[in-house]
């Protein structure tokens, strides 16, 4: 060739140095305001792996680095946001925040990335009250459930961070979603939400229509949670209206959608090609789990649902999100596991008396599988048949919605949850049975300072078989649930003095009111 003196098929390149620009949130020891540790090293590691997964997805929204399907948005440009995944899709979806934001609040107390997303979506609310799920498709992706997740995540933001100014600013947005959009999509004959079209409408892009259990259970949850916040803010009319509606929808859901033959809720819509108004013989993890957490079912029915689900869907890598693939046979729904929705099932197990062992079992199967397979330190978007990434190489392997292990361990094993904005009131109800744990300790950030909790099982020979230490901010108050450990009449002491409390053998706890400050609780046989 004419350029032969100047080119060659062989050669070498010398590199004198390599550097990496880390643009995501850099979690270092000094940025952690929350923590978790327990006697099971795996659980401890998974808590921090979950935080790292969310750190990787926390970044500045830039037009040339985000989802290419018309997701670039000048109202988000340059803001800290919480993306759904570190590499894919690189767009902040509000449903993902239902888990990912909790992980962020409980680890670094970093709310800016979540607030940016929630505020931006509120500002794009449609005139009928619908709120877009993300900026993708020019804020036009037609998901039916995500306005409810906006409500839930907005309440989370206020409860965990104390940002009541956000609530005041966007209260009418919240009301318009609950009282406008969803009220207009309610079947007056049944009192249930009814999705008319069969196009995709939720987090998994499922072809569901009709009085779908998941949509209605999530509606009950959103109404109840918004009512709780309204009460804290002194908005009693809103609180009463939403609480009443939540109760009515919950009763209608039990009346119309519960399948007595298996002891679980139907998915709620027709089978493919079947007539509208019929119920397909299929059941889903999302609706059943959230119905339990929303208080639709009593403890007996909740346990019945959870026992069925364990028997019908258990895999070595978690529990599948459907008990059948009839809605889309080629997609093998009965072998697909979403850690996102599994969060709600595991939470339902922790919240249901007698189900703690199954909660720890599912937690260990799910997160143990991801931790023992490449990349080992981040949580996957979804798991498919045989435990492989559910969309092959296209699967996001660092997805914030899959980090439920963080709020599960903090919210149930430590037992710390806010009851009013900014943890001004709180509950500390640790689940100490079922997981084989000898001790656990950790910290939870609040606007007034940290809540510190540690508990341990003691040597039975000393007479004291359990000790719980808490320290909460001055001026706060709450309820402490002291585990009775199966004892019929234990001696429970608070700060060295016996307290006269009645224990509930069903829940396995004795409830004690406590003011802020340091307290030590002991249980003696």
Annotated model-derived regions:
Residues 356-525:
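Non-catalytic C-terminal accessory modules of carbohydrate-active enzymes
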Residues 2-21, 517-525:
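Surface-exposed interaction regions enriched in Ser/Thr/Asp/Glu
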Residues 1, 12-181, 285-288, 336-340, ...:
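Substrate-binding groove/exosite segments of carbohydrate-active enzymes
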């Amino acid at each position: 060739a004419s350029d032969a003196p100047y080119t060659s098929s062989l050669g070498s390149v010398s590199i004198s140095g390599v550097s990496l620009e880390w643009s995501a949130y850099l979690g270092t020891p000094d940025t952690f305001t929350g923590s978790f540790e327990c006697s099971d090293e795996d659980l401890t590691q998974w808590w921090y792996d979950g935080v790292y997964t969310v750190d990787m997805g926390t970044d500045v929204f830039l037009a040339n680095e985000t989802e290419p399907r018309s997701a670039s948005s000048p109202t988000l440009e340059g803001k800290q946001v919480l993306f759904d995944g570190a590499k894919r899709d690189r767009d902040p979806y509000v449903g993902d925040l239902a888990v990912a934001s909790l992980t962020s609040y409980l680890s670094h107390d970093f709310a800016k990335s979540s607030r940016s997303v929630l505020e931006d979506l509120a500002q794009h609310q449609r005139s009928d009250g619908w709120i877009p799920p993300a900026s993708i498709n020019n804020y036009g992706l037609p998901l039916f459930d995500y306005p409810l997740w906006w409500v839930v995540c907005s309440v989370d933001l206020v409860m965990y961070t104390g940002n009541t100014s956000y609530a005041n600013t966007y209260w009418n947005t919240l009301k318009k979603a609950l009282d406008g959009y969803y009220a207009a999509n309610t079947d007056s004959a049944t009192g249930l939400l009814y999705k008319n079209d069969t196009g995709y409408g939720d987090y998994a892009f499922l072809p569901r229509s009709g009085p779908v259990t998941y949509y209605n259970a999530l509606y009950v949850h959103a109404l109840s949670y918004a009512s709780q916040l309204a009460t804290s803010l002194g908005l009693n009319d809103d609180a009463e209206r939403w609480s009443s509606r939540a109760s009515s929808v919950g009763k209608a859901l039990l009346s119309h959608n519960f399948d007595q033959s298996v002891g679980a809720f139907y998915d709620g819509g027709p089978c493919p090609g079947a007539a509208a108004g019929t119920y397909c013989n299929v059941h889903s993890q999302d609706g059943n789990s959230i119905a339990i957490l929303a208080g639709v079912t009593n403890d007996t029915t909740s346990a019945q649902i959870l026992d069925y689900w364990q028997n019908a869907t258990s895999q070595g890598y978690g529990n599948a999100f459907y008990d059948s693939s009839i809605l889309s046979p080629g997609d093998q729904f009965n072998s697909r596991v979403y850690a996102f929705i599994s969060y709600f099932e595991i939470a339902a197990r922790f919240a249901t008396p007698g189900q703690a062992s199954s909660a720890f079992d599912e937690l260990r199967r799910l997160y143990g599988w991801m931790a023992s397979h490449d990349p080992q330190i981040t949580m996957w978007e979804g798991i498919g048949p045989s435990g492989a990434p559910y969309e092959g190489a296209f699967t996001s392997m660092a997805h914030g919605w899959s980090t439920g292990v963080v709020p599960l361990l903090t919210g149930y094993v430590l037992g710390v949850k806010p009851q009013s904005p900014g943890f001004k009131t709180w509950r500390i109800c640790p689940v100490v049975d079922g997981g084989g744990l000898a001790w656990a300790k950790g910290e939870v950030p609040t606007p007034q300072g940290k809540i510190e909790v540690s508990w341990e099982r003691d040597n039975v020979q000393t007479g004291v078989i359990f000790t719980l230490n808490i320290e909460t901010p001055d001026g706060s108050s709450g309820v402490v649930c002291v585990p009775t450990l199966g004892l019929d009449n234990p001696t429970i002491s608070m700060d060295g003095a016996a307290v006269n409390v009645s224990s509930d053998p069903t829940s396995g706890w004795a409830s004690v009111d406590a003011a802020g400050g340091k307290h030590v609780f002991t249980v003696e046989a």
